[in-house]
């Protein structure tokens, strides 16, 4: 929301941009005007239609998985096209939602040789931004699923009814879940675990 943008990010924007000579800040619109004509704005994704009509050179989504997916597909993506702009997506996993789908798209595009995509998964245990003692304390006070999602970037932990979530996460971490070449001339067999109140799993062989 607009209030969250102001509370969480606005002070950082002013701190880092304030050292630029000639820069000005609009507190009402959460807008920064640079002396070269450039502009930076903090916007709310709460109402996608309120963003229509803007033009963008770059857009950064924070906690993309918590936002309405219409914002990207119907508003921001078209706004970037005529200026050949770019987008950055940041967030915390929350199951197999549109943030997960975007990550899978990035992986697929990179596998196909595209240089227009990049992704990075930063786990707390690897980044060392959080001390090991704090991670140990958090692990002791949270369920394994909560810890894996919030600290270790697990998209599987948050899926209700994912009985094999931990096993799948371990398989992914160990490189046992990957893409393999296949011959379209051979038949493919599938086994379906139909999800009623949770996700459907499909195995291919």
Predicted regions and their residues:
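Phosphate/NTP-binding elements of NTP-utilizing enzymes
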Residues: 1-205
